[in-house]
Amino acid sequence: MSDGPGDNNGNGNGYNLARHLNWSNIPVEYPADGIERQMFVGNRMMICRFRFKPFLVTPEHDHPHEQMTIVERGRVRFFIEGKEQIAKAGDVLHFPSNCWHGATMMDEEVVLIDIFSPLREDFLPG
């Protein structure tokens, strides 16, 4: 397997070879106060690891990207299409394209794994 062209952090397009990385080798970004984000980007999909401080709120929003979310650690109060759901470590959620959703982290640090297709261009540098 190869890391492909460009840098070694998985952030780049044009990969046609398989890649194998570890989260510990992927740079951490800080898109907002209380949020850490790591991204591993492919040609048509991406996976992001988010770490949220307790009680942080992500406002309700929608986007054209299909999204799968895995709760790796903690508990989250999700608001999905006007309904409230509590998700805990081990739970998996699916958000179809243009699904209205948001979340409030509960009383502990939360780690979420989000998979998006197509790529979230708004997350990419440049």
What are the residue ranges of the model-derived segments?
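Short acidic-glycine-tyrosine-enriched beta hairpin
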Residues: 82-97
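Histidine-centered catalytic micro-motifs
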Residues: 59-66, 99
